[in-house]
């Protein structure tokens, strides 16, 4: 099972240049927000309404070098990455607004 992280192409490109991805939420909240495939649509509506330029990162939890914790939010467990996202854990990217 993969988990997803929604970001902008610019933030993802910066992470690729850096060699690891660090979303601004990591310094603000201490973790990177993620979702399951089933949570994607609600996450887009709740947090990304009106934003057109988005990219979804597909992440293999088994390859994470940072801790992954499942924590309750909005009445259900969401995956949170507690540290930088190592690039080799990202198995692919896609436009989250396009049907798959």
Place the predicted regions along the sequence by residue:
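Conserved, structured core segments of small domains
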Residues: 1-100
């Amino acid at each position: 099972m993969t988990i997803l992280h929604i970001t902008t192409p610019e933030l993802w490109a910066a992470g690729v240049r850096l060699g690891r991805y660090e979303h601004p939420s990591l310094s603000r909240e201490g973790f990177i927000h993620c979702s399951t495939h089933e949570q994607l649509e609600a996450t887009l509506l709740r947090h990304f309404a009106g934003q057109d330029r988005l990219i979804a990162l597909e992440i293999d939890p088994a390859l994470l070098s940072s801790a992954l914790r499942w924590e309750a939010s909005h009445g259900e467990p969401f995956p949170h990455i507690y540290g930088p996202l190592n690039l080799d854990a990202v198995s692919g990217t896609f436009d989250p607004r396009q049907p798959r």
